[in-house]
Amino acid sequence: MLKQFIRISARMLAGLAALVLTLSTPAARAERPVLKYKDQITVKAPPQKTWDSFKTFDAIHTWHPATEGTKLLVGQNGKALAVREFRIKGGDAFVISELLAFDEAKKWFRYRIIKTNLPLSNYVGEMRVKSAPGGGSVVLWSATFQRPEENPKPDQDDAATEKLVQGVFKAGLDNIAALNSK
């Protein structure tokens, strides 16, 4: 009886291993690839002035034209683990994000979205300022993210998610340049 039990258990284990291997292949599931997007803009102002115009974590509404009502929920500006919330103008969309790292000397910060009703997930972004060749500065904005669902609606596929992030970056970078062109 014990030998029979061991044989059945071994067959079940082999079958379970085969099932796990089958389900872990890309063809067996609709994977959500990690998407990447980056953009930059050259600004006439020196790096410090440009950095000062967008570095305050709970003041995104002062430089991004699509946002309003930013408030700090946890922590302090310029300190890791600070959490902010802001709304998107003209609707009920919101974003709650967490500051992961901030470096005043290097003019750089990293953040992640922890909750949103926008159609994206697992978003981690970075913003930085560098000196531009010949004067001025360059603002670099990059992010990794995923579409919200494994089997997305047509308007929430990878291309739509990338287009959303591209629009957010363009509007923000263009406004940073406008604020620093004087």
Where are these regions (language model features)?
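Hydrophobic ligand-binding cavity/cleft-lining segments
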Residues: P26-Q76
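C-terminal segment of classical bacterial N-terminal signal peptides
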Residues: L19-A27
